[in-house]
From Swiss-Prot:
Signal peptide region: none
Function: Involved in tumor formation and increases auxin and cytokinin effects in host plants.
Compositionally biased spans, kind Acidic residues: 164-178
Residue segments, region Disordered: 161-185
Provenance organism: Agrobacterium tumefaciens (strain 15955)
UniProt keyword list: Crown gall tumor, Plasmid
Protein name stated in the entry: Protein 6b
InterPro entries, per database record: Glycosidase
Length: 207
């Protein structure tokens, strides 16, 4: 089975937290069982018949990209991730949709993203009332953590949008140059990024 055959789980009619948790866990388990452990998913623009350098490990935990409803539904249908920062980056978080209300979540998203991108959290809580559940690829880097109810919840952004603490792209480029020139890394960047979407859901949940 390939990513193209994966049917995005539509969980928008699930209104109870307990059922949402179990459905998401089932989707995560099914995704890992049906695909290989390392999944390449984006056809290469420079190597015909091959994939670019972005991949995901299909046995990991889910993270969430929060959006407004119309963008969420279109992205799930077309297997896209939208940008939620001014440099076309995509930020995802381990904070699950049942942990806080839309207004509180919106404040957290504003603290982590600037006023740019297709999804702009500064426009209000309606911008984060739906979610796409995904698994982060190798092009995501973890850039921060929030502690909520004594639990750690991480934030990750696609590589190039932010740097891990202590990381220096200039040094990396110099090292590659001294090594005789490493192969260029190819991955898709833009307002909409082709990406495996595991599930779509609403944050309007009750206990």
């Amino acid at each position: 089975m390939t990513v193209a055959n994966w049917q995005v789980r539509d969980l928008t009619l699930i209104l109870r937290t307990g059922e949402m948790k179990s459905r998401l866990e089932q989707a995560r388990t099914d995704f890992g069982a049906l695909l290989s452990e390392t999944v390449y998913f984006q056809p290469s623009a420079i190597r015909l018949g091959e994939f670019d350098d972005e991949y995901i490990h299909s046995r990991q935990e889910l993270v969430y990209v929060y959006l407004r409803e119309d963008i969420a539904r279109q992205c799930a249908l077309r297997r896209n991730l939208p940008s939620n920062s001014s440099n076309f980056g995509t930020m995802a978080t381990a904070i699950p949709p049942w942990l806080m209300n839309a207004r509180s979540l919106n404040r957290v998203m504003q603290e982590r993203c600037d006023q740019g991108g297709l999804v702009n959290y500064y426009q209000g809580p309606h911008t984060n009332q739906f979610f796409l559940a995904i698994m982060p690829s190798n092009c995501f880097v973890r850039f921060g953590t929030d502690i909520i109810n004594n639990e750690n919840y991480g934030f990750x952004a696609r590589r190039g949008n932010t740097l891990e603490e202590g990381e220096d792209d200039d040094d990396e480029m110099d090292d590659e140059g001294e090594a005789g020139g490493a192969e260029p890394r190819e991955c898709q960047i833009g307002n909409l990024i082709n990406y495996p979407i595991i599930a779509l859901g609403s944050c309007d949940l009750s206990a």
